[in-house]
């Protein structure tokens, strides 16, 4: 099976950006595994939308259960270049979920995406949050307006 990527130049550029970020994060998380965990790396799993015809993605999943309770760094690109009924041209995204076993380390969720309509109008969305398991009042004061 083979993934077919979106045809538009901006979707291709967005995919290159989020794939670069994905590898950056996976390399850093693997370095943490080597230093503090079981030295196991994140495993890559590829998936396909409609058999790859409308894209798909690559997910790196944590395999070290001494450091990460749950972890994945996902890149996906779904497109409908061949479907005149759809207004969406493509959606390209990096989504990350990292939950540590250490309760003093906050969980991290991040989503960076490029969405492009067939009218060629597109937009970036970026969101992230840190979710501490144990309250730290001085840190709360730093992040609260």
For each predicted feature, which ranges?
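Context-gated lysine
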Residues: 2, 12, 86-87, 118-121, ...
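Serine/threonine-rich low-complexity intrinsically disordered regions
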Residues: 8-10, 93, 138
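Internal mixed beta-strand/loop scaffold within catalytic domains of large alpha/beta enzymes
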Residues: 53-126
């Amino acid at each position: 099976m083979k993934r077919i990527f979106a045809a538009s130049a901006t979707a291709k550029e967005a995919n290159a950006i989020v794939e670069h970020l994905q590898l950056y994060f996976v390399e850093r998380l693997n370095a943490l595994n080597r230093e503090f965990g079981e030295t196991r790396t994140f495993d890559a799993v590829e998936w396909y939308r409609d058999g790859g015809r409308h894209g798909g993605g690559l997910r790196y999943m944590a395999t070290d259960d001494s450091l990460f309770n749950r972890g994945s760094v996902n890149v996906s690109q779904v497109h409908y270049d061949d479907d005149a009924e759809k207004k969406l041209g493509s959606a390209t995204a990096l989504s990350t979920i990292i939950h540590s076993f250490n309760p003093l380390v906050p969980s991290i969720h991040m989503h960076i995406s490029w969405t492009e309509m067939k009218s060629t109008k597109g937009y970036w969305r970026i969101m992230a949050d840190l979710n501490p398991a144990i309250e730290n009042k001085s840190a709360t004061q730093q992040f609260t307006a």
